[in-house]
């Protein structure tokens, strides 16, 4: 799961995106062209992902909601656990509900920054979620330049760092210096996120699981 993602990927036609790992995955995958987030804000959208229900149905549409879920609502990983799957979440649990703690307890065998399918019993089927924060607005727009250089640009080669002056500015944005800077930072973060996706795909290969695992991005 990536945060604050627009279709800023090569496989969706963004000529400025450098996302070789996701693009390679897309070439051998089903590519959704008419799929949209259930809600435009992160926590309400996450409540949809964990329950499989629209925030308008669960009462979780208000950001930072403490509203309880409708009676009997379960997180869908609970059903996977019932079926014998080892379920892991790495690591965000911002489910925007008074029931968030219960969802964490009932949905996940492991939920932490160390959660991984490799912690399961060998041959046990698994469902593993990895939440990549690097494209979150707090990183793309808020981090001071020094932190951004350390956490993002230091992981990219000079050719992979996006030059604000060379980016294509979508017509719905004003073509200003500030907008170009924001777009460049965002594209850099997405490039690092792509590296992280590549690392997970490599781990599946190393474990001999690549041909037996369904990967959703």
Describe each region flagged by the PLM.
Residues 1-217:
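Formylglycine-dependent sulfatase
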């Amino acid at each position: 799961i990536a945060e604050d993602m627009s279709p800023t990927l090569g496989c969706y036609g963004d000529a400025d995106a450098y996302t070789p790992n996701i693009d390679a995955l897309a070439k051998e995958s089903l590519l959704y062209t008419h799929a949209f987030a259930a809600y435009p804000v992160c926590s309400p959208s996450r409540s949809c992902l964990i329950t499989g229900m629209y925030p308008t149905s669960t009462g979780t549409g208000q950001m930072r909601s403490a509203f309880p879920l409708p009676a009997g609502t379960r997180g869908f990983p609970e059903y996977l656990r019932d079926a014998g799957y080892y379920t892991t979440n790495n690591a965000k649990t911002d489910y925007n509900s008074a029931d968030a703690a219960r969802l964490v307890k009932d949905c996940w065998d492991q939920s932490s920054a160390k959660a991984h399918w490799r912690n399961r019993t060998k041959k046990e089927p698994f469902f593993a979620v990895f939440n990549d924060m690097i494209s979150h607005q707090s990183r793309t727009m808020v981090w001071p330049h020094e932190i951004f250089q350390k956490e993002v640009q230091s992981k990219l080669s000079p050719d992979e760092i996006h030059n604000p002056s060379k980016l294509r500015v979508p017509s719905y944005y004003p073509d200003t210096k500030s907008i170009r800077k924001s777009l460049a930072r965002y594209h850099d973060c997405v490039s690092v996120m792509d590296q992280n996706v590549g690392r997970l795909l490599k781990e599946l290969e190393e474990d001999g699981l690549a041909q037996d695992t369904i990967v959703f991005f």
